[in-house]
Structures are given as structure tokens and as C-alpha cells.
Amino acid sequence: MTIDTQAQEYFSKHRRIWEQKPVLRRIYEEELFARLLSSKTPGGISIEIGGGPGFFKKLFPEVISTDLISCPWLDVVADAQALPFQTSTVTNVLGLDVLHHLAAPMKFLQEAERILVPGGRLVLVEPWITPFSRIIYRYFHQEDCDLSAQPWKLEDPGIAHGKKAFDGNQAIPYLLFGAGNRQKTLAALPSFQCIKAEPFCLFAYLLSFGFKPMSLLPEMFYPGVSRLERLSLPLWRRFAALRVLLALEKSRDPRVAKETDSGGAAPLQR
């Protein structure tokens, strides 16, 4: 089975479940996508990395949606680790569940730093490691949760060799941006400052079972569960949150910004 065929089947399955589970749509649109949109810089050009099944594009149609695989609902076929956009031309780089799937996540972060305009933002929603989420991800999720990985290496043989397109290590975002490692990561990204690292997400997503066919959360109960989750967030975010909102802003000081370009990149068109 080719990677394109595998991807089409994967996306088709997700699109089918998306249509069948209104509570899942509400969680994504009112929690995950809403956090991405509320944290971006207004105006300008926004691109989505890992557009996949096209759910975010439906909510935010002006975004330039990209993925490694060609799909009718996506705008650009692009490798997140070698983006085909000119330096300092993009206002926002947005992504949901992308960073932990990449073979060389630091290459992507450097590419985002390169293509963003001064004041532009990289905004991501990713898995996050807490004492509770580590149990969930390690024992109840199909993707790896390997805290021994070294994501700062631009070419990590332990990650890159033999990696399939949909393989993931849900520990990667925490390893890069957890409090103990954040400065190490930012030292390799001199134009970036981390303006948000906000853990969230618990009850509603767990009860919905995500992209599995079953759900323990009827849509009619979602508003109450969502309200409870928001009100109680300060009590559990440090030890039980499943996800994190990350926002990195590129410095407006031209003396800080890198002057690198990938050469041959085409200018963006609205």
C-alpha cells in the first residue's frame, strides 16, 4: 500500500467519524480550533501545517492548508520540514497534532521561524505529558510516548529511520517545551519567544473517545461538561491535562531575525 493510499484511507475514516459524532466536532471547533484562532496574529497570511482531513479549513477557509499528501480539500502539498514559502512572508503558522509526528521537529520549528514575518506566530495544539496523560498515552493510545527521545537533533536516527508517515511520539512537544527544556529549544530558535504554553483538555475529550466510533458523552451533555472543565482547569492542568496550547512569536527586532532563505521558494499568493 502506497503512502498516498494509506493516507486517503486514514483521512476518509476520520472524515466519516467526524460526520457521525457531533460532540467530537464541537470539541474540536469550540476548544481546539478556537484556541488556535484566538492565539494567532490578526490579518496577513496564515498557513496550516498537517491539514489532513480538512476540518480546520472548513472553519477557517482563508487559511492556506498544507500536508505531505495531496487531497482535493488541501491547497498545497508541502513537507513541514522544508516549507516551500519565501522568508518572512507568512503571518501565522498553525497546526493541530503535527509536531509529534515529524521525524525532525527542530527542522520544522526552524522553517516556521524562517517564513514568519516579524511579529508573526507559530501556534500549535499538541499532546502534553502530565502524570495522568502519560498513563493514557502509554497504555491506551496507539502512538508511542517515549520520553527518552532526543528531538533537538536535526537528524535523529532513532526517529527518522524506518518512520512511517502516521507514526508519532506524543512526548515530543513536552520534551521540547516543558519547563526544564524550553530554554534549550529556544536557544536554537533565536528569533522566537514562547508567549504561551498552556496545558488544557481532559473530561470532554476522554469521554468522547476521540476518533473512535463509540462515545460516552452525548452532545446534549457537552456544554455542561465543557463548562465544568473550564472552571476546574486550574485544579488539574499541571497533573492531568492531555494537551497544550503553544504559541511562539517571532521577534520584531530585525537584528535578532535570521537572514537565511531556502532559495527558490515561491512567493505566497492569497
What are these regions (language model features)?
Residues 183, 187-190, 194-270:
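A C-terminal cap/extension of S-adenosyl-L-methionine-dependent methyltransferases
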Residues 94:
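A conserved beta-strand element that flanks and buttresses the S-adenosyl-L-methionine
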Residues 106-118:
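A short glycine-rich, Lys/Arg-flanked "PGG" loop and its adjoining helix->strand segment in the class I
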Residues 1-81, 242, 254-270:
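Conserved N-terminal segment of class I S-adenosyl-L-methionine
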Residues 82-87:
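Short conserved loop adjoining the S-adenosyl-L-methionine
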Residues 97-98:
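Short catalytic micro-motifs in class I SAM-dependent methyltransferases
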Residues 164-181:
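Acceptor-substrate binding/catalytic loop of class I
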Residues 122-161:
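Conserved class I S-adenosyl-L-methionine
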